[in-house]
Each structure stands twice: as C-alpha cells, then as structure tokens.
C-alpha cells in the first residue's frame, strides 16, 4: 500500500518537476537554448562601492525592460574597460569621452547611444589646496599661475580628469614639465579630491559632477580645498554598445537598449534613484559624431594613435 501511494505521488509531482526545470523566459531563447547574459560595465572613475550600488540597481532595471539576463562586470581601470569591450566581454559600457572614442575605434559598428542631460555641456574643475596660495582664476590664461606647483590628474585615460584639463593647460601655455616634480595620476576623481585636500598635491583637476556630488554629501572639507576654475564645456560620458548584440538577441536590440535608458523616469522612485546615482535628471540620445573634438584632442596629446 505504501509503495502504491509513493508511486502515485511520484506521478502527480512529475509534471510539476518538469515545469520547474524549464528555464524562465529571461534566460532561454524560443528554441529552449540558454541565453547569454547581456553584460554591462563602466570606467572605474569613482569609489568602487558607489559603482557597485549603482550598477546593481541598473542591471535589475535593464533585465526587467529587456527580458534577458543582465550582468554587471567591474573592471580594474579605464584601459581594462576598453579592452573588455574590444574582446566582447562587455556589451554595454559607460565610458568617458576619450575611452568611448578609443573603444569605438577598435570595434567596427560600435555606437554611442545615450548620454546624461549634463554630458552635452560637461566641465572639468581645477581645485587647489587652500594653503597653496593659489587664487581663483578668472579665465584660461590664469592657468599659468599653476606653474611651479605640484599637480595631479585623475586616471591617465580620463576625459574630464586628464584629457581636457591637459588640453586647456596647453591652450594657456602650460606644459606638463612646468609643474613641480612628477605629475600625478590619482586613478579616480574621488582620489584627486582626497590628495589635494590632504596637501599631497597643491592642485588637481577632476569631473565637475563628482565634485558637486561629494560637496553636497559633505565628503569634502571646503576649509582645505576649493575650486579655482571651471573649464568651457565639452561632450563627455556616454553609453557605447557592441553591434554583436544584434546577432545574439535581435536586430532591434540596440534600439531596445537605447529606449530603456531614455525611458528612465525621475517620477518613478526606483528609477529616480538610478538617475540620482548617475547625477542625471534623464538620459538623452547621442551619436558618434558628437565626440569628434574629443578624438582630435586625444590624437593631439597622443592618447589616440
């Protein structure tokens, strides 16, 4: 009798077991094959913990919008982000202006598809330790006052933390050898603030949005460090997508990803949190041609061959 009951129970549960073993629609294709994860990444321009919090929320949103598994893969530095995009380890990457150009030049058909509302008119800020006696600068020619002082950029491949500040310095007639000692490369905008605030360098340059964000959150001691100049505007951060996603998912997948990014709504609390972490009110469309100035400057200072 017991064996009969067990047999009956097995027959009843078998269909449920078969159903539960099927992959869900987000991880399987129409023919039942496993779907490869859509991978996202970003240049590590800020504190890794902040980036992890941001991208965990974004991947959840994209997964729900796109109906495919989405995975965030952190990278160690700016060059690693470009390499990962080139070899296909990352499908969608949040690049700065320079790294975005570098990545697209290495992947035929790669597209810049979206940027924040602030990225069409982005700025770098030059900051100085208040004990340095470096005074606020009124125009680009005032950058000459930085000669003879120690100075740090951010990452060597940062648009707002290296490329454009070096460009404006050269426009003012300031060469890297005019600074005291070896020029610094802090590795991130947050680190630049910390080094100048601590007096390790008398001055530095970084992303304006990161500066404002850290000031607003009380992470900067304004008794020790201040902004001395804001650059003219330029195009900067943007999303770049690999064209191979069309083969893997669908012909319209690039358009679907772009639509999902543009759809982020500040009136929806969960989506506003994502936008706030990006320092944006919304995402807007962009295209490859917007970064022609960045490419020209990159070639001029030897960051693009």
Residue ranges and their predicted role:
Residues 15-18:
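C-terminal motif of bacterial Sec signal peptides marking the signal peptidase cleavage site
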Residues 33-41, 46-57, 234, 240, ...:
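An extracytoplasmic/periplasmic, membrane-proximal ligand-sensing/linker region
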Residues 44, 124-136, 235-249:
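A bilobed periplasmic-binding-protein/Venus flytrap-type ligand-binding module shared by bacterial periplasmic
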Residues 56-67, 159-185, 215-221, 296-304:
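Ligand-binding cleft/hinge of the Venus flytrap
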Residues 72-83, 96-98, 176-194:
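Short helix-initiation/N-cap motifs at beta->coil->alpha
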Residues 94-107, 170-171, 197, 202-223:
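A ligand-binding cleft/hinge motif common to bilobed small-molecule-binding domains
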Residues 110-119, 179-182, 215-233:
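Short beta-strand->loop
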Residues 116-172:
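A conserved helix-loop-strand patch within extracytoplasmic ligand-binding domains
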């Amino acid at each position: 009798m017991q064996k009969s009951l067990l047999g009956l129970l097995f027959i009843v549960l078998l269909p449920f077991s078969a159903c539960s073993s099927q992959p869900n629609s987000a991880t399987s294709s129409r023919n039942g094959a496993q779907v490869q994860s859509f991978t996202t990444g970003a240049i590590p321009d800020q504190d890794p913990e902040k980036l992890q919090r941001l991208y965990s929320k974004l991947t959840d949103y994209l997964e729900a919008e796109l109906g495919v598994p989405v995975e965030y893969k952190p990278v160690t530095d700016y060059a690693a982000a470009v390499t990962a995009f080139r070899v296909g380890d990352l499908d969608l990457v949040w690049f700065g202006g320079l790294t975005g150009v570098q990545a697209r030049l290495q992947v035929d058909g790669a597209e810049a598809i979206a940027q924040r509302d602030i990225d069409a008119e982005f700025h770098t800020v030059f900051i100085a330790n208040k004990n340095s006696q470096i005074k606020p600068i009124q125009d680009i020619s005032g950058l000459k006052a930085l000669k003879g002082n120690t100075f740090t950029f951010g990452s060597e491949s940062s648009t707002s933390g290296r490329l454009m500040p070096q460009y404006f310095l050269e426009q003012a007639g300031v060469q890297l050898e005019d600074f005291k000692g070896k020029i610094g490369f802090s590795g991130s905008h947050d680190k630049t603030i910390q080094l100048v605030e601590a007096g390790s360098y008398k001055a530095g340059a970084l992303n304006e949005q990161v500066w404002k964000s850290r000031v607003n959150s009380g992470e900067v001691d304004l008794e020790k460090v201040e902004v001395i100049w804001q650059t003219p505007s330029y195009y900067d951060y943007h999303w770049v997508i690999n064209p191979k996603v069309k083969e893997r998912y669908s012909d319209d997948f690039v358009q679907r990803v772009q639509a999902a990014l543009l759809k982020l709504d500040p009136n929806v609390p969960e989506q506003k949190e994502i936008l706030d972490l990006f320092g944006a009110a919304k995402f807007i469309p962009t295209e490859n041609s917007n970064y022609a100035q960045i490419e020209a400057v990159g070639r001029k200072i030897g960051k693009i061959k």
